[in-house]
Amino acid sequence: MRKIAIVSFQGEMSCFVHALLNVWNYHERGYETALIIEGASTRLLSDIPNSPKGELWGKIKEAGLIKSVCKACAAQMGTLQEAEKQGLPIDSALSGHSDLEPFSRDGYEIILF
């Protein structure tokens, strides 16, 4: 089974939604899929649940596809408490940021958004 890790960095909702759409698409097609939320995209954690794509966000969360939210970036963007409230996996293994190396080691192809 192929493994895909999608890393969302951009802070625009349209870019984040495209990352979500692709994560779900790969998941539905049988890929082992991971979503890593980094950089400015962590700012959107407060907005996405009540957005037009909130239902998709809920499905992705329920399926356990969100594997990492950058602790340093979420703190900088003011959404760390929101990430914790949503029960998202917080990662600070790389000097406070999400560590991509374990995904590479585990054979994931990494796609950046």
Listing of model-derived features with the role each one plays in the protein:
Residues 80-113:
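C-terminal structural segments of small proteins and small subunits
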Residues 49-90:
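Mid-chain, well-packed structural core segment of small domains
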Residues 7-9, 36, 113:
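Short hydrophobic segments within beta-strands
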Residues 27-28, 61, 84, 104:
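Anion (oxyanion) recognition and catalysis
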